[in-house]
């Protein structure tokens, strides 16, 4: 298979951000939004080299005149043409490599439709002619990155959250809980509650502004009701944010009302369990002998776990659910925003992993369905 001098490429295609780089590196070289933007208006200026589509940061910088679309929703690719554009941009513009010379490791959310995996495999081999590829579950990679082999990973990104129990390196698929509630839903909710304040955010470009406010100013309250009282009584919690046009927006209780949805999905009308409850359900679906090890290794990963106060709140909520004598430890590694990618980088540079790749020859022989046999 792959020679020792050929570096594998690791591509973590999130619903919100695409993280890409070379195996063995300690951080991704390229991190850009998983966005494809198309012009709203026809171009009339001569000499401007207008494209029919822009990807990533370029789309972000021209967002005022583009319609922005995310090809990945809730971890599932909904638009394959745009997805190909993102991969093309990743290989040729960001990493500047020829994909036909490098094995590629891709990631996906657990409990994804099988067709999604097959199509990914097909595009990699047929469109990009990669010599070998592999698809891995995101949460498992996060655990690798934290240096553990046992733990319960809560991975929450822009499109999907899931809790995955892993024991001695084995993921326990029957106990995985998937929650289609993540960063993008929080951004949408924030757009809605800011409307109550009289600020209108409606376009795809304005959604990106709200996402920025969310990333910079929100936090998770340890006691939501208490925090609401405090916010009503004083303006101590208020923060201001300067919009691109120079206007200043003041936000108060929206700062902690937004991420509260993670613990109370009913706030956005979703009939689902909060992230603390999903974690608890996952652990309860596991064998009674391994629960203790899972409770003391709850590992957070993904961008939506970056809110200040999340580990304290998580510990508090789980302590209320778990048996009273149970020791609960929530681990929030500082690099958790990229831990899926880091785990992929570690995994694909291991010598023992080299026989795991799906090679072009195997693909030609069996077709896309080989991905279910070779990739757990």
Curated annotation (Swiss-Prot):
It is found in: Cytoplasm, Cytoskeleton. It comes from the Eukaryota. GO terms for cellular component: cytoplasm; cytoskeleton. The keyword Magnesium does not apply. SUPFAM superfamilies: Actin-like ATPase domain. Keywords: ATP-binding, Cytoplasm, Cytoskeleton, Hydrolase, Nucleotide-binding. Pfam families: Actin (PF00022). Its main location: cytoplasm. Its EC number is 3.6.4.-. It is an enzyme of class 3 (hydrolase). It catalyses: ATP + H2O = ADP + phosphate + H(+). Signal peptide: none annotated. One of its GO terms (molecular function) is ATP binding. Belongs to the actin family. Actins are highly conserved proteins that are involved in various types of cell motility and are ubiquitously expressed in all eukaryotic cells. This is Actin.
